[in-house]
Swiss-Prot record:
Native source organism of the sequence: Anoxybacillus flavithermus (strain DSM 21510 / WK1)
Gene Ontology molecular function terms on file: NADH dehydrogenase activity; oxidoreductase activity, acting on NAD(P)H, quinone or similar compound as acceptor; quinone binding
Catalytic activity: a quinone + NADH + 5 H(+)(in) = a quinol + NAD(+) + 4 H(+)(out)
Cited InterPro entries: NADH_UbQ_OxRdtase_su1/FPO, NADH_UbQ_OxRdtase_su1_CS
Chief place where the protein resides: membrane
Protein name as catalogued: NADH-quinone oxidoreductase subunit H
Family per similarity comment: Belongs to the complex I subunit 1 family.
Transmembrane intervals: 17-37, 88-108, 117-137, 159-179, 191-211, 241-261, 273-293, 313-333
A GO cellular component annotation in the UniProt record: plasma membrane
Amino acid sequence: MMEQLLQSTPSWTNVAIFFAIGVGLLLVVLGFVTYGILAERKVMGFMQGRIGPNQVGGRWGLLQTVADVLKLLLKEDTIPKAADRPLFILAPVIAFAPAFMVLAALPFTDALQFADIGVGLLYYIAVSGLTTIGVVTGAWASNNKYALLGGMRAAAQMISYEVPLVMSVIGVILLSGSLNLNDIVAAQKDVWFIVVQPIGFLVFLIAAVAELNRTPFDLPEAESELVAGFHVEYSGFRWAFFMLAEYVYFFAMAALTTVLFLGGWHPLPFLGFIPGAVWFALKFSLVVFLFIWFRITFPRVRADQLMEFGWKVLLPVALVNIFVTALVKQLFF
């Protein structure tokens, strides 16, 4: 259906259909993120010996996050007098829009994908970097020293870890011979890339956590140092945009990890009778659990340690991985 719409003559009907599909996808994403946050809180509670949300929506707290969303929507929307008003208003949208856009290129099964982009991996890397513009814009427009420092940290962290993140997937590109995410999954039909690219997987995983600004790399919004970081002056639904962008990227990165290193929807040997969507969901959930585990386990690192680790450890390891992968492919494939 999507291919037919793309190839058809442009018309207002097509625009309306695309708009309706976009709104529907946005509602699905928001619903998934809402209950994804609840799942994270329950897992964190379990790991810390707590019950977690259990008051709103029954024993499992199923409506707790919904109540939190309603609370955010009802909160007063304040704009500081000294803020750059147009940029302050626009920044949350700039931060959230790319997070929503990257989902279009991610294949969840061989039949479930919004748009099959020939260079889906390149598209994801390019578009995801735009969110930092929104973060820095919001930090600067707030006219607050803590917000500005958080925005500068976010920009420095993104630059420092985007490089090893991209370098870590070059081994995957060498083995699959494509930037198309569907082709990358197809290349893992026999052997998942986590088996032949363990170093690349570790570098990608660490760099992904840093890109997501999650513990132990949550320096741009370190409460003990910066109050709330780059969004310290935001409240209500504008603050919710930043939070949603963070969690949409969180789940999108887990899906990308599944596609690049865990074989996507391909099953384990002798278990092909289980549908591909189930396999993708299981692998995706495993990666999400791993990210949550990191948040619970590790303490926050210092800013200088963060920069030093990215440039002096991850980047050289990623370069060595590229060299070894190219050598092995040349000799044995």
